[in-house]
Amino acid sequence: MPKYRSSTTTQGRNMAGARSLWKATGMTDLDFKKPIIAVVNSFTEFVPGHIHLRNLGKLISSEIKLTGGVAKEFNTIAIDDGIAMGHSGMLYSLPSRELIADSIEYMINAHCADAMICISNCDKITPGMLMAALRLNIPCIFISGGPMESGKIFINEKEIKIDLIDAIKYSADPNSADDLVNQIEDSSCPTCGSCSGLFTANSMNCLTEALGLSLPGNGTLLATHVDRKKLFIQAGRLIVKITKDYYKNNNENLLPRNIASRQSFLNAMSLDIAMGGSTNTILHLLAIAKEGNIDFTMSDIDSLSKKVPHLCKISPNSTTYHMEDFHRAGGVMGLLAELNRINLLNKNINNVLGLNLETTLNIYDILTTKDKNIINMFRAGPFGKKTIIPFTQSYRWPKLDKDRQKGCIRSYEFAFSNDGGLAILYGNIAKNGCVVKTAGVKKDNLIFTGNAIVFESQEDAVRAILEGKIQKGHVIVIRYEGPKGGPGMQEMLYPTTYLKSMGLDQHCALITDGRFSGGTSGLSIGHISPEAASKGNIALIKNSDCININIPDRIIHLDITNDELLLRIENENKKGSLSYTPLYRQRYVSPALKMYAFFAMSADKGAVRKIRF
């Protein structure tokens, strides 16, 4: 019998008490010879992306049992960023990532589980689970709940696709009729699943494919489609195979750190840049890499952003395409195949299927595959019926989107730009870098100069926008919203969406040491590092200061002399205990958030905790 981790609690006379407790959960003596596989679920009725996961843990557990393993399910917390948005609840979102990772470590190590299968979906849950996977480095597969279908409404007798961002945008527009706002509210999120655009949740689920830790189709196959059930069944069977191979044959090739290597992280970031994904993915990939002791930094991201083309625009960067359309065009595998054609990928990396990337693309690229089952899977589309139940429909597109000139995925020859949809800027405001989603910035705004209008909280900035105090040419500065200063690094979806509803999104810039929702577009620059609370120079900006932003040259610059900058630093330090703190902000910070703030590092380090011993 192989030496499973779980033998610590299942073998030997001295473990009679532990075995007695295991038996009380339904295990038998025969089960003690099998691998114990943790089914790490994240079901909650608070989140549409997780509302349908309750029974999916049971589905996977049954497959594990049939394949010769013992499944033991537990749950993590899951916060809905959309519901937590716009109030103090958003302070808790990013810190929950660390709690999720820690809770998984606690459960896995306390009970000596042999492997795990992670059922994730939304914003901080997938990153938290990935952090745990790299930290623990035991056999692991990711399977997500899948994206929801896009909403559809008719305006002027024409059907248009909508999503959550439309509900926020139209409700903030004083010119929108109440009936229209109500219609959009009722139609924006029609089914279970992660929101239908390429926001943080779907970006991260796509990246699990690129990292090699999930099955092809995981990031794009709709939650409502019957084909997604096949992914769950396949994942449940595969985790047992991988686990037994590791413990019986000492095959370490499919352990998380050997799959998600430095080369895999570079591939994942290249995918993210090519599809113009959420800027949050940068934050999370840095944190996940750190857990695996993988050398992956902002410098790598900066280098990739200058050579990886922008090949795909999905909502919120497009009003035409949503995740269902990305899937029809070949999804993650289709986009990776385009990057592979121009030699921008590391091909000799493995995935949970035990295949290298080149072989995987030969099988799953819709432009070249001969496999009818693969073609059929990528034809899986939306049915257009409201539901919170998964696997309820089997609609298929009449044909695939293979148009690489004007379709959802473009070839290099027809790229939106030769450098990608994300960029890292540096300058005296952000010595350690900051992030902008160029996919959401119009060409006219790639170079922008404006005067600062400074706020020390998101709430004050929102109030100023809604009261009409923001003018064309302003650079809105929202500081003390970083990991430490917030604390919790709030998302700035409401300020950016309100700017859009006021018609100012292409005439202003917004810079912050906070972060942005994956639904953000416009000239929105976040993750400024060091943050204000860590003595970053964003704390020194004054109203009316001139700020220069040059995305092609990767520069963000406060237009003052170096002598003036040094003087401002000196004056700030004279404030003693009040230096580098928000002076006028009133905000309750709970003990739990204070603990996170005490350990939190700036965004260029992934906003992870620096544990001091």
Curated annotation (Swiss-Prot):
Any one of the GO CC terms: cytosol
Cofactor list = [2Fe-2S] cluster; Mg(2+)
For Mg(2+), which residues are the binding ones?
81, 123-124, 491
GO MF terms here are:
2 iron, 2 sulfur cluster binding; dihydroxy-acid dehydratase activity; magnesium ion binding
Keyword list (alphabetical) reads: 2Fe-2S, Amino-acid biosynthesis, Branched-chain amino acid biosynthesis, Iron, Iron-sulfur, Lyase, Magnesium, Metal-binding
InterPro entries, alphabetized:
Dihydro-acid_dehy_C, DihydroxyA_deHydtase, DiOHA_6PGluconate_deHydtase_CS, ILV_EDD_C, ILV_EDD_N, IlvD/EDD_N
One GO term under biological process is: L-valine biosynthetic process
* A Pfam family reported for this protein in Swiss-Prot or TrEMBL: ILVD_EDD_N
Active-site residues annotated for this sequence: 517
Note describing how the cofactor binds: Binds 1 [2Fe-2S] cluster per subunit. This cluster acts as a Lewis acid cofactor.
Q: Does the keyword Magnesium apply?
A: yes
Q: Which reaction does it catalyse?
A: (2R)-2,3-dihydroxy-3-methylbutanoate = 3-methyl-2-oxobutanoate + H2O; (2R,3R)-2,3-dihydroxy-3-methylpentanoate = (S)-3-methyl-2-oxopentanoate + H2O
Subunit record text? Homodimer.
**Which family is it part of?**
Belongs to the IlvD/Edd family.
- Under what name is this protein listed? Dihydroxy-acid dehydratase
Q: Which organism is it from?
A: Buchnera aphidicola subsp. Melaphis rhois
